[in-house]
Amino acid sequence: MSEMDEAARRQAIREENRNLRYLRFMVDLALMEIRSGGLTLAQAGKIVENLRRQALALFPGKETAFDLIYRPRFQRAIAETYQLH
């Protein structure tokens, strides 16, 4: 692997790590907002869908990953906050 290829690979890894940190921050922020109870159920659902779109913009083609990793957390937070048991 050439030095240029290695530098490009390191840059791509840095960018992916930055995107992942940003996504984690946005997920945590959305969960806090949902758990605050100040939103309607419809607004909470809209936040989740908007965040999913943002996640897919950062990580195209990773719909399944979002649905497996983050959607259950949001469903649990919504169920607990809005007492949907």
Which residues make up each language-model segment?
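Helix-rich interaction surfaces within compact, conserved domain-sized segments
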Residues: 50, 55-85
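Short linear, low-complexity motifs centered on an aromatic residue
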Residues: 13, 41-56
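Residue-identity detector for glycine
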Residues: 37-38, 45, 61
